[in-house]
């Protein structure tokens, strides 16, 4: 697996930085885009919404002059000053009277701070709002506290220095100081800004608003400093790579990779030679040589000293190396790096870096030499680094087998050193000489001589023999040529056999299982990576796009660990799938207001439909003109919405963007691009899935649509007449207008000939204009487009119904011998027998041509004129087929029959307007069609015997 690099791609952390700067200061601010018309608001925090009572949906895209917060008592001079500051891109502070949503007013102190880019151009404005009454209360409380402290201090000091009889006593001064508290409380409760602006009091210092501005100058300067144009305080609105402190080393840099491999080789050297040196340091021969030739007589000791120095340098480098925290963020702050290293591997690295050879050189006693030699085995703690370094290769089968073999050999090497140390320690004290070293000397003809320290087998013979014994014992293949003879040797042999049986069973006995288990994940990774590379090679993807593909694949693999959630869920029953999905999306379903009040079953059904997606910075989620078939919920990160490369909105956590599906029968097209600024986690649900679930829970559907607040509606309002609104009474249209029942219901069916009267009707149905003329014009255009959209959809349905009815009429005229389907109520066969044989199609005088029209063909209006002609001599009972291109066709009679009934075959067809043709979600389905009205039912023909004549 690749190195865990963390979130190292360039990110636009503008919004996250501003929120992090302000979250501990209880700020109420908004951000406006200076490059848009009217400096539209693109973000407002929760504190602003709580202060004024508006939701974020109601504030977004409004001008940053905040005209919606002004009222009748708002001074025009303050509004002009604010507008002038925005127009001139100047920093200023404005004291203004604003109104909340509930019509309550309060005095507000507004700080306007322009934000410039790297070229010096103003791109954004940040407006900070403070309640002036709260500032006065804080300033007054601080002033009272200071005065109480000063009075108490002066009173206590004066009581000791004032002569008797001069001034009040200590008791009276104390009482006076305390007596001010109730009076201040009363004044504070009855505090009136206008009353105390002109007046003054001797007991309590009432601060005027301009004094508040002066006293809060430091606070405002802090805000300005936070919002200043310096690159080290306020981030620029652009993609920025993570800032790395000077002197720190990236954990994925080439230098760190080379250094890690060098340390890895040194650790392997330590693991091999440290037990060997510790075992042979116990020999008197080495000690005697050390005393005669000094510390540098052994090259191995010099190498050990160099290794110790390298380990110390590695500790210093680790204090300056970045790491990845639990949030996949690269941490480069030296203090945080030091704390993280102290809590982790510092103790192990420090113990392993102690230069024991220097201590041995300074102390010459045998006991100290033996102890220090044993302590050198602490260097084996460095093997933890090997496991940490090689863990990333644990999914490669060949590497795993190689590591297992090396581990087996390393353990055998350690046991061989211990086996030699046991024999070397016991040999001088054994009588008779039955140890394995004496037996080896007898076999080789190199017996030990007590007077000659150099006697006996060579070091190579002793080490190879010890290694041979440990390998044969670990693999349970003992030949007996090297055998334990003393009790210590036998106990050690038992331990070796126990370790060998465990290792043999766990490693060699399960090699096939280890290979299969380890190859599964890496096989999937390499298979997917190979597909990506083949796709890139086949389609000749350019290098920048190729790099994005590979980085996204690696990041997505590390993010999901190659787990396909859909494939995993398919193996579980549906009830368990719903529970798992409910757990995965629990944060969204619990905190989003739109899902509150839903039943457990509804939440389970919604959770199954939700999908989670992860987007890296710079990835475009929605392009301009894309079909809006998905609703997105942001759970982490921030995104920007662009129109013509101009930022129109910045969305963050808990924001929603897309299109409210309740307002339109068909999905619209996106009016902007949606691009990720940081690494984002989003929940998305398809339009069809959402409507399907809400159709199953109609009681919750109304609550959901009322509570759903889409932070930014991406639907293109000017994209043409594409869909029909699916609305409920009292809801909002796509542009935010509230429609009543008469406006949102199905409009009457209008004919093509009546389109000339459309404009006066639309003008009469328009709602009252708001006070702002510009908003009035925008509302009129949007309402007009909405009405035209309704009209177009209803005319399309009307045309399909008329074509269907005409095809049925032509089919009836083609088959005169059969029973007419339009004769309703004829039940007896005798009625058909008595029906006259002369019909319209058999008349010689008739010129009605229908024989060449296929029965399944649907005719248009022009084709009908070619096939249906009016005869010259037409019987009173012969039907006149008249076409009205803009009306629904129904039969009418030229002569009224007795009883007020109409004969369809003796009368021409007359037009009839049928209200309410729309309103069905799927009008083409038979089960959704409404019942036939009574005036549409064809009556019996006059020659029908069942017809009652008067």
Swiss-Prot record:
Cytoplasmic face residues: 1-261, 320-340, 392-398, 512-950
Non-spanning membrane segments, not crossing the bilayer: 464-484
Q: Which residues cross the membrane?
A: 262-282, 299-319, 341-361, 371-391, 399-419, 491-511
Domain (PAC): residue spans on this chain: 92-144
Write out the tissue specificity statement of the associated record. Answer: Highly expressed in celiac and superior mesenteric ganglia, but not detected in brain or in heart. Detected at low levels in retina. Also found in pituitary. Also found in the olfactory bulb (granular and mitral cell layers).
MF (Gene Ontology): inward rectifier potassium channel activity; potassium channel activity; protein-containing complex binding; voltage-gated potassium channel activity
Residues annotated as region Disordered?
Answer: 154-174, 719-750, 890-950
Topology within the bilayer:
Multi-pass membrane protein
Q: Where in the cell is it found?
A: Cell membrane
Q: Catalyzes what? A: K(+)(in) = K(+)(out)
> Which positions fall inside the PAS domain?
41-70
Q: Where is the composition biased (Low complexity)?
A: 898-912
Annotated Gene3D superfamilies = 1.10.1200.260, 1.10.287.70, Jelly Rolls, PAS domain
| GO CC list | monoatomic ion channel complex; plasma membrane
Q: Where is this region: cNMP-binding domain?
A: 594-694
Extracellular compartment ranges equal 283-298, 362-370, 420-463, 485-490
Instruction: Name the keywords, alphabetized.
Output: Cell membrane, Ion channel, Ion transport, Membrane, Potassium, Potassium channel, Potassium transport, Transmembrane, Transmembrane helix, Transport, Voltage-gated channel
User: What's one Pfam family the UniProt record gives for this protein?
Assistant: PAS_9
Q: Name the residue ranges of motif: Selectivity filter.
A: 476-481
Where mainly found?
membrane
| Subunit structure, as described in the record | The potassium channel is probably composed of a homo- or heterotetrameric complex of pore-forming alpha subunits that can associate only within their subfamily.
Q: What does this protein do?
A: Pore-forming (alpha) subunit of voltage-gated inwardly rectifying potassium channel. Characterized by unusual gating kinetics by producing relatively small outward currents during membrane depolarization and large inward currents during subsequent repolarization which reflect a rapid inactivation during depolarization and quick recovery from inactivation but slow deactivation (closing) during repolarization. Activates even more slowly than KCNH2.
Q: What is known of its domains?
A: The S4-S5 linker acts as a signal integrator where it both couples voltage-sensor domain (VSD) movement to pore opening and closure, as well as providing a binding site for other domains that regulate activation and/or deactivation of the channel.
Please report which protein family the annotation says this sequence is part of.
Belongs to the potassium channel family. H (Eag) (TC 1.A.1.20) subfamily. Kv11.2/KCNH6 sub-subfamily.
Q: Which PANTHER family match?
A: POTASSIUM VOLTAGE-GATED CHANNEL SUBFAMILY H MEMBER 6 (PTHR10217:SF468), VOLTAGE AND LIGAND GATED POTASSIUM CHANNEL (PTHR10217)
Name of the protein this chain belongs to? Voltage-gated inwardly rectifying potassium channel KCNH6
Which organism was this protein described from?
Rattus norvegicus
């Amino acid at each position: 697996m690749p190195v865990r690099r963390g979130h190292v791609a360039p990110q636009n952390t503008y919004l996250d930085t501003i929120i992090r700067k302000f979250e501990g200061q209880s700020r109420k601010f908004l951000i406006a885009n200076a490059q848009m018309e009217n400096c539209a608001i693109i973000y407002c925090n929760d504190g602003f919404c709580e202060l004024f009572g508006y939701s974020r949906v109601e504030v977004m895209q409004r001008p940053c002059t905040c005209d919606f917060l002004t009222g009748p008592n708002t001074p025009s001079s303050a509004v002009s000053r604010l507008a002038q500051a925005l127009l001139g891109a100047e920093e200023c502070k404005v004291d203004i009277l604003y109104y909340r949503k509930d019509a309550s007013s309060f005095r507000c102190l507004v700080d306007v701070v322009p934000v410039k880019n790297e070229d010096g151009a103003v791109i954004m404005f940040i407006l900070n709002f403070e309640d002036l009454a709260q500032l006065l209360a804080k300033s007054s409380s601080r002033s009272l506290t200071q005065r109480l402290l000063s009075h108490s201090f002066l009173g206590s000091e004066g009581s000791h220095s004032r002569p008797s009889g001069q001034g009040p006593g200590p008791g009276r001064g104390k009482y006076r100081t305390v007596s001010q508290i109730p009076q201040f409380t009363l004044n504070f409760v009855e505090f009136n800004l206008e009353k105390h602006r002109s007046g003054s009091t001797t007991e309590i210092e009432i601060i005027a608003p301009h004094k508040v501005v002066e006293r809060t100058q430091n606070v405002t300067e802090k805000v300005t400093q936070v919002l200043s144009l310096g690159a080290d305080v306020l981030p620029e609105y652009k993609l920025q790579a993570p800032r790395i402190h000077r002197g720190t080393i990236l954990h994925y840099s080439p230098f760190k990779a080379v250094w890690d491999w060098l340390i890895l080789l040194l650790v392997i050297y330590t693991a091999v030679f440290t037990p060997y040196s510790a075992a042979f340091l116990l020999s008197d021969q080495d000690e005697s040589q050390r005393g005669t030739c000094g510390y540098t007589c052994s090259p191995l000791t010099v190498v050990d000293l160099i290794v110790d120095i390298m380990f110390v340098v590695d500790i210093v480098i680790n204090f300056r190396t970045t790491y990845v925290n639990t949030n996949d963020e690269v941490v480069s702050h030296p203090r945080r790096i030091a704390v993280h290293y102290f809590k982790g591997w510092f103790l192990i690295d420090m113990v392993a870096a102690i230069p024991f050879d220097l201590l041995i050189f300074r102390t010459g006693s045998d006991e100290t030499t033996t102890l220090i030699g044993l302590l050198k085995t602490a260097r084996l703690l460095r093997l933890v680094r090997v496991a940490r370094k090689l863990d990333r290769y644990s999914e490669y089968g060949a590497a795993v087998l190689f590591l297992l073999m090396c581990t087996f050999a390393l353990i055998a090497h350690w046991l061989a050193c211990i086996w030699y140390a046991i024999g070397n320690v016991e040999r001088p004290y054994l009588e008779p000489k039955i140890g394995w070293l004496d037996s080896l000397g007898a076999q080789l003809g190199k017996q030990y001589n007590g007077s000659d320290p150099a006697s006996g087998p060579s070091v190579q013979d002793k080490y190879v023999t010890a290694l041979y014994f440990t390998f044969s014992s670990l693999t349970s293949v003992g030949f007996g040529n090297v055998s334990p003879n003393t009790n210590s040797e036998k106990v050690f042999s038992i331990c070796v056999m126990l370790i060998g049986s465990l290792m043999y069973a766990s490693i060699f006995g399960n090699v096939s299982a280890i290979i299969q288990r380890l190859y599964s994940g890496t096989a999937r990774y390499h298979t997917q990576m190979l597909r990506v590379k083949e796709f890139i090679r086949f389609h000749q993807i350019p290098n920048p796009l190729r790099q994005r593909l590979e980085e996204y694949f690696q990041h997505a693999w590390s993010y999901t660990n190659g787990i396909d959630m859909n494939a995993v869920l398919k193996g579980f029953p549906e009830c368990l799938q719903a529970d798992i999905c409910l757990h995965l999306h629990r944060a969204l379903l619990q905190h989003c207001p739109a899902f509150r009040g839903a039943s457990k079953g509804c939440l389970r059904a919604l959770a199954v439909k939700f999908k989670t997606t992860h987007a890296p910075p710079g990835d475009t989620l929605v392009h301009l003109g894309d079909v809006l078939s998905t609703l997105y919920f942001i759970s982490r990160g921030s995104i920007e919405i662009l129109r013509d490369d101009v930022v129109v909105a910045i969305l963050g956590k808990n924001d929603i963007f897309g299109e409210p599906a309740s307002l339109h029968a068909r999905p619209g097209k996106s009016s902007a691009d949606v691009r990720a600024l940081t690494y984002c986690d989003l929940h998305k649900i398809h339009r069809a899935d959402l409507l399907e679930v809400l159709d199953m829970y109609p009681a919750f559907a109304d609550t959901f649509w009322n509570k759903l607040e889409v932070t930014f509606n991406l639907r293109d309002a000017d994209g043409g007449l594409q869909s029909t609104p699916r609305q409920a009474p009292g809801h909002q249209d796509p542009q935010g207008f509230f429609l009543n029942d008469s406006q949102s219901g199905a409009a009457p069916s209008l004919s093509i000939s009546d389109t000339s009267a459309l404009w006066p009707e639309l003008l009469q149905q328009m709602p009252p204009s708001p006070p702002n003329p510009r908003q009035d014009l925008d509302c009129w255009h949007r309402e007009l487009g909405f009405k035209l959209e309704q009209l177009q959809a209803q005319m399309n349905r009307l045309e399909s119904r008329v074509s269907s009815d005409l095809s049925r009429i032509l089919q009836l005229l083609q088959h005169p011998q059969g029973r007419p389907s339009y004769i309703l109520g004829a039940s007896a066969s005798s009625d058909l027998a008595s029906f006259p044989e002369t019909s319209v199609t058999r008349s010689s005088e008739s010129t009605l041509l229908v024989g060449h029209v296929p029965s399944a063909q649907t005719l248009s209006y022009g084709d009908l004129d070619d096939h249906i002609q009016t005869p010259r001599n037409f019987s009173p009972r012969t039907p006149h087929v008249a076409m009205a291109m803009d009306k629904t066709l129904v039969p009418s009679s030229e002569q009224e029959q007795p009883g007020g009934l109409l004969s369809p075959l003796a009368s021409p067809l007359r037009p009839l307007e049928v209200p309410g043709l729309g309103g069905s979600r799927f009008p083409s389905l038979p089960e959704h069609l409404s019942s036939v009205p009574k005036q549409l039912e064809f009556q019996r023909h006059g020659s029908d015997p069942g017809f009652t004549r008067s």
